[in-house]
């Protein structure tokens, strides 16, 4: 378990038993999320739809702390086709948000299966997406930090040594934070498993 903290913004859900209070499902599809399929993890089956179009299901949000903060999770997910995605989100509205996680993009300027950071401003994707090829099927830890108007995405294979994926400058109002999965265009059920979700304040 994490060390005791005096951080007033600290929050952690290890997804054992029931979801902790203050979580809010956006377009919940109860048949496609589970806390029992993989005990100790939240499994969300990646469906179609996009945040920007208000068509994705089972986006899980909670109030963001004020000031600077970092959100973190550990994700098991192996995307295999366009444009499957699962990861963290800092959210103002369907038009203004930042999502960071594992995804798949097969085109000339994409990294294929990899790590991506997508910033949407007024409904339009802001380049770059910092795509880095990543094909390991092992769980990967992800964290997304807000420091003023700087948003930074880092990842780690062991939860100790973190590497930078990318960073964007944004004036969004980070009202909510949480987990997101979607953008599957075709194919069958594709599970994404989140081992925990954590919030910490930053100086």
Language-model features: locations:
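Extracellular glycan-recognition regions
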Residues: 1-203
């Amino acid at each position: 378990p994490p060390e005791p903290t005096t951080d007033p913004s600290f929050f952690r859900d290890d997804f054992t038993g029931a979801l902790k209070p203050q979580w809010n499902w956006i377009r919940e599809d109860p048949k496609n999320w589970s806390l029992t399929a993989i005990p100790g993890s939240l499994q969300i089956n990646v469906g179609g739809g996009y945040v920007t179009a208000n068509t994705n299901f089972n986006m899980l949000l909670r109030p963001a702390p004020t000031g600077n903060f970092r959100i973190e999770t550990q994700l098991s997910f192996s995307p295999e086709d366009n444009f499957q995605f699962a990861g963290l989100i800092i959210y103002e509205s369907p038009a203004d948000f930042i999502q960071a996680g594992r995804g798949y993009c097969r085109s000339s300027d994409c990294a294929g299966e990899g790590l991506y950071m997508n910033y949407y401003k007024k409904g339009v994707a802001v380049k770059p997406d910092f795509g880095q090829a990543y094909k390991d099927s092992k769980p990967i830890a992800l964290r997304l930090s807000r420091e003023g108007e700087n948003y930074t995405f880092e990842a780690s294979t062991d939860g100790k040594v973190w590497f930078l994926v990318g960073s964007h400058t944004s004036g969004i109002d980070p009202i909510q934070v949480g987990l997101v999965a979607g953008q599957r265009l075709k194919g069958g059920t594709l599970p994404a498993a989140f081992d925990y979700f954590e919030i910490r304040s930053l100086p």
